[in-house]
Structure formats: C-alpha cells, structure tokens
Regions:
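Anion-binding alpha/beta catalytic cores of soluble intermediary-metabolism enzymes, centered on
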Residues: 1-165, 170, 179-235
Length: 235
C-alpha cells in the first residue's frame, strides 16, 4: 500500500508522515499528486498543504462536477460526516441530494447505516422573516422529503445542529458549502473537535482533502483515515 501526501507551505505534513507506521511518499505539486492517484501508483492521497482548488480542478477533468467533499469529524466521542464543506458546493437542492446520496453510499460501503441530519437557516417559526430564510427552510424540507422517499433515514433539524448531533446523526448536510465550511472551522479549529480529513465523494480513487490550517496530529489523522479506507476497500 502506498499513500501520497502533498507537501506545500505547511511542513507539519512531513512530521505527520514520520509518525505513521505505513508507507507514505511526499509529493510537492498538485499535478503529480493527481497523476499518481489516477495511474494507480498511489492507493490513496491526501492533499496535505497543497492547493485545494488546483487539485479539485484536475480531478474534475475526469469526474466533471459530480464530486463533493465530506469532512469526517469526531466530537466528544461521536463521529460523523459533514457536507458540503467546499465553498462552491451544495448551492441548490439537486447538488445537496447528490451529496447526500453519495455520502450514504460511502457510509454503507463501510457497513454503517446512514442517519442524515439536514440543516437550514432557521427554525420552523422563522418562516416569513426573510426570503433567504424561507428559501433555506423550504430547501431543507424538500431535501428531507426526497431522501425519505428514497428510503434514506433523514430528518430536518432546521438550524438546530446541536439536536442533530445529540440524536446521533452520522451525516450532517449543511445549508450550503460556505455554511458547512464555517461549521467545520468552528468545531475543529476552534471547538476542540478532531478532523480526520474530508473524503471526496463521486470518484473511484481515494482522495482525502485536508485543511492548510491543520497541525501535525490533524495530518496524521487524515493519513490514518486514508489508510483505513484503502484497507476497507481490499476486504
């Protein structure tokens, strides 16, 4: 098994590589990282501290716009996926539906039954306060209804993310990618949660996105997540 790790400005990636007990090789350009992933030289890759936008652009040359990222987060012993987290992802119901279905398939592939918590921009009684709030709540209701019709366990928690986590949701769908990115940063970079990287959905290869703000332990967890996914795919 070979895992590629991107090394950019944040050199904590190198220290993380030295802390794991499996083979990881360093890559210093986005083009090389994607090439090694696509030609099979690497069984998985993590972004490390390379450019996310450049890597995603290269990946989309093969996979079009059907890809999205879901962060794997651990908070107070509970583990869950959070998506969308790319600021240009999840802008409408169709995109969020693709993300929800792809993430559900990913969880099922690991033997985990998806339990989706859909979020929106207000409580039910907040409808009428603004067109933006109304649109967000309506989209949350519609997305939840479609998922239930497709036999996926889903509940609309509106703006109450804390209730979704308390209820044991293992896949949180944010109102859009900007909101999801802010939730990720609040939980992982400020709130003491642990980030394990973001799995890229909608592609055959295993690619884990990571934040350039990660520390050594954050990159180490992402490497271990990639290693776990490769081992799981071999079963």
């Amino acid at each position: 098994m070979r895992i590629a790790a991107g090394v950019g400005q944040n050199k904590d990636v190198i220290e993380a590589i030295e802390k794991v007990d499996f083979e990881v090789f360093k890559v210093e350009s986005e083009e090389e990282l994607v090439e090694y992933l696509f030609n099979g030289f690497a069984d998985a890759a993590i972004r490390g501290s390379l450019s996310a936008s450049k890597i995603m652009a290269k990946l989309r040359e093969k996979y079009s716009d059907k890809m999205s990222r879901a962060s794997f987060i651990e908070l107070d012993g509970q583990k869950f996926l959070l998506a969308p987290v790319g600021i240009d992802e999840g802008d409408d119901v169709d995109q969020k539906l693709l993300i929800a279905e792809a993430g559900s398939r990913f969880l099922l592939s690991l033997g985990i039954k998806p339990k989706i918590g859909v979020l929106s921009g207000g409580r039910p009684q907040d409808k009428g306060r603004s067109k933006k709030i109304d649109k967000s709540i309506d989209e949350g209701n519609l997305l939840t209804s479609i998922l239930i019709d497709r036999f996926i366990d889903a509940k609309h928690y509106f703006i109450l993310i804390e209730d979704a986590i308390t209820d044991g949701a293992n896949f949180i769908i944010a109102p859009d990618g900007i909101s999801g990115n802010l939730i990720f940063r609040s939980i992982v970079l400020l709130g003491g949660g642990k980030g394990h990287g973001a799995v890229t959905l909608g592609m055959d290869e295993i690619y884990i996105d990571t934040s350039r703000s990660n520390d050594v332990e954050g990159y180490k967890r992402a490497l271990e997540f990639a290693h776990y996914l490769v081992k799981s795919s071999e079963r």
